[in-house]
Structures are given as structure tokens and as C-alpha cells.
Amino acid sequence: MVRAVAVLRGDSKVSGVVTFEQVDQNSQVSVIVDLVGNDANAKRGFHIHQFGDNTNGCTSAGPHFNPEGKTHGDRTAAVRHVGDLGNLESDAQGNIKTTFSDSVISLFGANSIIGRTIVIHAGEDDLGKGTSEESLKTGNAGARNACGVIGIAV
């Protein structure tokens, strides 16, 4: 079992922890999300970005992690960036506590997310279904509310 964790912070009031667990390189990754400070009852884009660099805040994390050069899509789409994790939805208090599994990201090999940055955005991800060219790159999810580098955990 490999376990990785990211502590998210940013210029907004959003903060929290995202944990990733994978039994072996052939299994799905469990993603455990615990975030606070979001707007109430809101959907927010959730992506893994290319770089583990937060020296200039979340901006220096670069674009979505996309080693296969695909267009943007939903977490469940056949065509998507490796880093596309769709939307998270907050409750009436602005908290997000959820767990899901993903078979595209990995804690092993070429699609490893270790050392990259996880970002929660200020807006809802249109999942690549918008009318602008930006939709196919970012999902028009807006500013980067909070982020954290994904590191190996015990």
C-alpha cells in the first residue's frame, strides 16, 4: 500500500487535506477529501496540476497534469487529462468530505501524481463541454482557491 497526502492552502479561506491510497500499481487510487471554507452548496473544479511548485502560490503549479496530450474532460470520461478529477460539491456549511476511486491517476509509474500539485478551483468545471477553446484545456474552472503538493505519507 502506498499512501500520499497533500495539505491544501491558498489565498482564499479554503483549506484541508487530500489523501491518496493505492494498494499496488494495478489497483485504483482511493481519493479521500476533507476541505473547509468553500462557498455553501457549490461545485468546484478539482485537478492535479503538472508541477509540485507552489513558490508563487497555486499559479506556479502549471497546467493540468496531461502526459498523454488529451483534451479536458470529466473524471469518468474516456478522454481526459490524467489530472482531471471533475467537480467536488460542498455542503450547506461549505465543507467537502468525500471519497472516490480513480483508475487513471496512480502513485506508481508514468502517471504518478506524487510530487505534483492538487488544486481546488474557485468555479465549477464545465468538464470540457463548454463552447470556448479554454473549456478543452481547463474546464473554465476559474482561479485556484487552494493547493498543495502531493507527498509520500506513512
Swiss-Prot record:
InterPro entries: SOD-like_Cu/Zn_dom_sf, SOD_Cu/Zn_/chaperone, SOD_Cu/Zn_BS, SOD_Cu_Zn_dom. The keyword Oxidoreductase applies. Homodimer. Gene3D superfamilies: Superoxide dismutase, copper/zinc binding domain (2.60.40.200). One of its GO terms (molecular function) is superoxide dismutase activity. The gene is sod1. This is Superoxide dismutase [Cu-Zn]. SUPFAM superfamilies: Cu,Zn superoxide dismutase-like. Its cofactor is Cu cation; Zn(2+). GO terms for cellular component: cytosol; mitochondrial intermembrane space. Pfam families: Sod_Cu. Disulfide bonds join C58-C147. It comes from the Eukaryota. Zn(2+) binds at H64, H72, H81, D84. Destroys radicals which are normally produced within the cells and which are toxic to biological systems. Binds 1 copper ion per subunit. It is found in: Cytoplasm. It comes from Schizosaccharomyces pombe (strain 972 / ATCC 24843). It is an enzyme of class 1 (oxidoreductase).
